[in-house]
Amino acid sequence: MSNLGQQSCSACSADAPQVTDAEKQTLLKDVPEWQLIVQDGEEQLQRVFTFKNFVQAQAFTNKVADLAEEEGHHPAILLEWGKATVRWWTHKIGGLHKNDFIMAARTDELY
């Protein structure tokens, strides 16, 4: 069982390495609901969360925002009626770092 959800983000600099393909495959097993996507040439993790109404989706996005502030690592969030789409990636390195998988796991715990 993964402990990604219990981990915190490490400081990341612009020269930090992106996760390797092998690391991605291992880490994805810990966040199976998340998909790898490419947006604007950068690989990202994305998941769509569904809710019964707008208010529940909004409350969830507020929890994700609080988590992001706590960790100093911020996602893209699209809030719509009955759903919220969350995308994690590390802006400084233009792709995926282990921090993104940690935040995906922690986001899952909020759902």
UniProtKB/Swiss-Prot annotation:
Could you mention a single GO BP entry for this protein? Answer: tetrahydrobiopterin biosynthetic process
Write the lineage as a comma-separated list.
Answer: Bacteria, Pseudomonadati, Pseudomonadota, Gammaproteobacteria, Pseudomonadales
Q: Does the keyword Lyase apply?
A: yes
Domain of life of the source: Bacteria
| Catalysed reactions listed for this entry | (4aS,6R)-4a-hydroxy-L-erythro-5,6,7,8-tetrahydrobiopterin = (6R)-L-erythro-6,7-dihydrobiopterin + H2O
Against Pfam families, the record matches this protein to: Pterin_4a (PF01329)
Instruction: Select a single GO molecular function from the record's annotations and give it.
Output: 4-alpha-hydroxytetrahydrobiopterin dehydratase activity
What's the Enzyme Commission number for this chain?
4.2.1.96
Coiled-coil-forming residues are none
What's the source species for this entry?
Marinobacter nauticus (strain ATCC 700491 / DSM 11845 / VT8)
- The yes or no answer to whether the keyword Lyase is present is yes
Q: Read off the InterPro entries from this record.
A: PCD_sf (IPR036428), Pterin-4-alpha-carb_dehyd (IPR050376), Pterin_deHydtase (IPR001533)
Q: Write down what this protein is called.
A: Putative pterin-4-alpha-carbinolamine dehydratase
The UniProt keywords, alphabetically, are: Lyase
Matches recorded under PANTHER family: PTERIN-4-ALPHA-CARBINOLAMINE DEHYDRATASE-RELATED (PTHR42805:SF1)
Q: Which family does it belong to?
A: Belongs to the pterin-4-alpha-carbinolamine dehydratase family.
List, alphabetically, the CDD domains matched. PCD_DCoH_subfamily_a (cd00913)
